[in-house]
Amino acid sequence: MTRPAAPALRWLLLAVGWLSGTSLQLQQPALWPPPLLLALGLVGALLATAAWRWPRGGLSLVVLAVAAGSLAFVATSGRAALRLADDLLPALEGQDLIVTGVVDEMPRSSLDGTRFVLATEGATWRGQPVGVPPLLSLGWYRGADDDALLGGPPEELRAGQRWRLPLRLRQPHGSFNPHGFDLELWLFEQGIRAGGYVRARPEVPAVKLADTVGRPVERLRQAARDAIMLSVADPAAAGVLAALAIGDQAAIERAEWDLFRLTGVAHLMSISGLHVTMFAWLAAAVIGRLWRLNSRLLLACPAPQAARWGGLVCAGGYALLAGWGVPAQRTVWMIAIVVLLRGSGLRWPMPAVLLAAAVAVTAFDPWALLQAGFWLSFVAVGLLVASEPAHAERAAAPPGWRARAGQSLRAGLRTQAVATIGLAPLSMVFFQQVSLVGFAANLVAIPLVTLLIAPLALAGLLLPPLWALDAALVQGLIAALRALASVPWVVWNAAAAPPWAVACGLLGGFLAVAPLPWQLRAWALPLMLPLLAPPVQPPPPGQFEMVAADIGQGTAVLLRTHGHLLVYDAGPQYSRESDAGVRVLLPLLRARGEPRVDLLMLSHRDIDHVGGAGALIKALPVAAMASSLEDGHRLLALGVPHWRCEAGPAWEWDGVSFEVLHPLASDYGQALKPNAMSCVLRVRGQASSVLLTGDLEAPQEAALLQRAGATLRSDVLLVPHHGSRTSSSGAFLDAVQPRVAVVQAGYRSRYGHPAPDVMARYAARGVAVVRSDRCGAWTLPAEGTPYCEREVARRYWHHPGGTATP
């Protein structure tokens, strides 16, 4: 007679099924039709009922896991459908709307203005009520080069305030590049289905209506952040304290984030499970001690139970104050499960507790499964649990404080080694890099941050003078990290690995830290090698690969031959704190395994073409730069060997020919506008050819036709000036005769790029037009069919793609 499975095993398989079903749903390019989801939900419910009523045998466990997966798939699909139903109507994009709502969370200021989330209460368009999404991501900027903005955001903009705002909105749309940050996923996860900016004008001002009592946690967070910023003079230290006290990671400047990533301590600069656990432990200890002082309280509830529940409540409060991030959520759910199990007299194995916490997190936020923080957080705890020595081994505390201190030191070193080695494969998977000084940096940073800096940051909320001491500790830590970051080979970079290498690397990381026989652990390094140094297949000699990156309104193209890399333009500068180099090109180059740039060609000086060049030059070795930049330009002072871009120079790399066709040397003395000085580059391989044109305009197109009309024919044309009416003359298109035309322009470009009449010229000639706002990054492989990133990697939360001419 078969026996019922143990409850812990049943819950374990239920959790595995739930997580598997959720993961499968997140891979769908489009949501299933409602009838199909309804049928799947009914099947899942029937299977769950059968497995629960007849809980005997291994088959019932499999049925239970399948049922849980089916129900998770349906539940996630239903929530996704509700969010997609909140989408902004296309007819309202770019229109002047009047929206009333409440500031939903603490605003975040930058040099360019303030960003905030508005919980909407009503909207009108041309005096008529219209529907808008419940949450809007908005910018209120300081100054602009058109009449869209008046003044800037008010100093008193705070969470909980009700405003009536003139807005221009658009649907969520972000850059779409291989291995890039998925902005549309992040907005979808937050429930934000439109974004835009405040367009205050004298005749339609922004009006503050009231201060509400809502959003008390966000108001408290904002007050705490403002107090820290006023109390601490050093911006770097103030940003770290704000991140550790209230979870405001945006307060940390980009330079400090780069330093923390290089040295492997970035995980400490957000409120993590370690911080929440220590806070809960301290709160439980204090509550238990105080509880024992009152006999009536002891009669009502035992002190250990009161301490556990009190610690849980305090942990939840701290996690809310921290912004309820995934690591904090995971810890709160784990503590809650342990408290419930202890209260009921049950003891589950730690893997079951960990999986139950993962189910709780994904039940509230299924899209957390796609975030690096989810996997780093849960895998870190799982590795520490899996690598624990036997309980008997740990239970024997040696006599004497020195021996106990030595044991604690060894345990700390071992824990750090487990985290560093075990998480290295995941770091390579998500970031294509791992810090080589992370072990040493964390030996100092973990005790300093968790035992001193983070507690003092919190204590400063009650006693602000403590922040001055805490700031000094942060400054010392940053100085030490900078010294570590100055050593050679501070970080190991590698290309994004194929799935088989990822699987081998993750298995190797587990074997490296698990308490297994050495015969098995010896396989750890060989298994991790394909992930740490994955095979990269360059184009064969005589051929090249082209990637037109999706960088919004601007230009950035990668050209890779067998042994060389050319970057043509570096995209725009998005703000005074962000550019295409940092946000798009560096992650893309890192994922492709590009260690250096052989030639950086900047077509002309416009900011949408050179905005990311500085970041590129500072982060990667750049062998040479060619441009039409004027003498004295800031980029020429960065130490890269430079030659002036002018017609004539031609060279060959690995059997692929390159030739500069424009401008002429004589053009440099004529004070032409920047567009007229665009570097035009022709690239020819054995199988394909490309013509890169920058912002070339019609007069220069005509001059180029006279000089080289017979040799302009190319398979691919980078559409001049993003499809502006100033360019793409009919005669020029007839000479080039492209099969594909690539337009790099922003979504709903404020300049109207690409112009419909220009696109009609291409359509009349049978040219296939690829638009980056619809296609994402476009790749022309050396061998195979060209493809759009939005087509091959589409998920249901993404903005619709497409390559057709409008």
Specify the residue positions occupied by each region the protein language model found.
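Helicase C-terminal subdomain and adjacent C-terminal extension
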Residues: 1, 5, 764-765
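Membrane-interface helix/helix-cap signal primarily in integral membrane proteins
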Residues: 2-4, 60-267, 578-590, 596, ...
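Non-globular, low-confidence helical/coil segments that flank catalytic cores
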Residues: 100-102, 124, 149-155, 159-162, ...
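Hydrophobic alpha-helical transmembrane segments in multi-pass membrane proteins
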Residues: 13, 21, 196, 248, ...
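Transmembrane helix-bundle signature of multi-pass membrane transporters/permeases
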Residues: 416, 443-447, 720
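Membrane-embedded alpha-helical segments of integral membrane proteins
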Residues: 6-51, 371-374, 466-514
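Hydrophobic alpha-helical segments of integral membrane proteins
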Residues: 213-231, 240, 248, 256, ...
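Internal/C-terminal transmembrane anchor helices
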Residues: 56-79, 518-540
